[in-house]
């Protein structure tokens, strides 16, 4: 049975952790879905892991739409959520509605995710939710603000920062967000936010106290040349793929394939 937004809230109430991974194409989406992941996020991290951009900032809405369409074609079970890319929603709530509507209508995703909190993004979330667009929030380290943060630094380390992030999360829930990603913040802060909100929190580099956990699939599978300190590689596909390709090339050169 397909995972729904309502199911995520039920799982939070039951204390059942939520698994989330990123996807950017049909083959990976199919495999991850068949393996039983709860949520697939078509994350703007695909800018780096699939398209070779240095940050998420160059990714366009058209590129995101292309990848979201590929992902939804491979999914039968997981809830598919898609990031709104940089500058596709910050200008106005109306711009955000057009961008989100494109992804829901043309790619078939169930919801969108946007970065930031109070006050502007909370207003945008409210605007979208009022018009039937389910929205996931994202606070803490928001990668689209990488230059403003002077890198991918941990957020919420001071009392002032921690209170700001907490208030942003509260505002996003009040605006109608159905869940919130908490990225690269201290574990006690993430736990406090999780206990304060009635909607699910999904952590990445935020400790074990969240309602669920998300990893970039390329990091989880050992495909990334570099991965953040809070990621965990469950295998080393980079090594496996390199070895397989080298073996194929060697077989061809020595007339071992085909036989």
UniProtKB/Swiss-Prot annotation:
Locate the active site.
183 (proton acceptor)
User: E.C. number, please?
Assistant: 2.1.2.11
Q: Which reaction does it catalyse?
A: 3-methyl-2-oxobutanoate + (6R)-5,10-methylene-5,6,7,8-tetrahydrofolate + H2O = 2-dehydropantoate + (6S)-5,6,7,8-tetrahydrofolate
Stored Pfam families: Pantoate_transf (PF02548)
> Is Transferase found in the keyword set?
yes
Q: Which cofactor does it need?
A: Mg(2+)
Q: Single Gene Ontology BP term?
A: pantothenate biosynthetic process
Grouped into one coarse class, the protein's main location is: cytoplasm
Keywords, ordered alphabetically: Cytoplasm, Magnesium, Metal-binding, Pantothenate biosynthesis, Transferase
Q: Which SUPFAM superfamilies match?
A: Phosphoenolpyruvate/pyruvate domain
> What detail does the entry give on cofactor binding?
Binds 1 Mg(2+) ion per subunit.
Subcellular localization, as worded in the UniProt entry:
Cytoplasm
Spell out the GO cellular component terms annotated for this protein, sorted alphabetically and separated by semicolons: cytoplasm
Q: Could you say which residues bind Mg(2+) here?
A: 44, 83, 115
Residues reported in the UniProt entry to bind 3-methyl-2-oxobutanoate: 44-45, 83, 113
Q: Recall the GO molecular function terms of this protein's record.
A: 3-methyl-2-oxobutanoate hydroxymethyltransferase activity; magnesium ion binding
Q: In which pathway does it act?
A: Cofactor biosynthesis; (R)-pantothenate biosynthesis; (R)-pantoate from 3-methyl-2-oxobutanoate: step 1/2
Q: Does the keyword Metal-binding apply?
A: yes
Summary of the function given for this chain in its UniProt record: Catalyzes the reversible reaction in which hydroxymethyl group from 5,10-methylenetetrahydrofolate is transferred onto alpha-ketoisovalerate to form ketopantoate.
Q: Its family?
A: Belongs to the PanB family.
Listed under subunit, the entry gives: Homodecamer; pentamer of dimers.
- Quote the protein name from its UniProt record: 3-methyl-2-oxobutanoate hydroxymethyltransferase
């Amino acid at each position: 049975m397909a995972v729904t937004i309502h199911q995520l809230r039920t799982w939070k109430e039951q204390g059942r952790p939520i698994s989330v991974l990123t996807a950017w194409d049909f083959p990976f989406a199919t495999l991850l879905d068949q393996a039983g992941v709860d949520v697939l996020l078509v994350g703007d991290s695909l800018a780096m892991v699939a398209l070779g951009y240095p940050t998420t900032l160059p990714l366009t809405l058209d590129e995101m739409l292309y990848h979201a369409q590929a992902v939804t074609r491979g999914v039968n079970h997981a809830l598919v959520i898609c990031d709104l890319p940089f500058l596709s929603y910050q200008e106005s709530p109306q711009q955000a509605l057009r961008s989100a509507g494109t992804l829901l209508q043309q790619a078939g995703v169930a919801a969108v995710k946007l970065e930031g909190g109070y006050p502007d993004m909370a207003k945008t979330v409210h605007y979208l939710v009022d018009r039937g667009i389910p929205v996931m929030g994202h606070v803490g380290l928001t990668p689209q603000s990488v230059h403003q943060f002077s890198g991918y630094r941990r957020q919420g380390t001071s009392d002032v920062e921690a209170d700001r992030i907490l208030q942003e999360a509260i505002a996003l829930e009040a605006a109608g967000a159905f869940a919130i990603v908490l990225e690269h913040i201290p574990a006690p802060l993430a736990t406090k936010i999780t206990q304060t909100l009635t909607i699910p929190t999904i952590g990445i580099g935020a400790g074990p106290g969240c309602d669920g956990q998300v990893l970039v699939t390329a990091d989880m599978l050992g495909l990334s040349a570099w991965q953040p300190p809070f990621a965990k590689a469950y295998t080393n596909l980079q090594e496996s793929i390199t070895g397989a390709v080298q073996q194929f090339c060697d077989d061809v050169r020595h007339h071992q394939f085909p036989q």
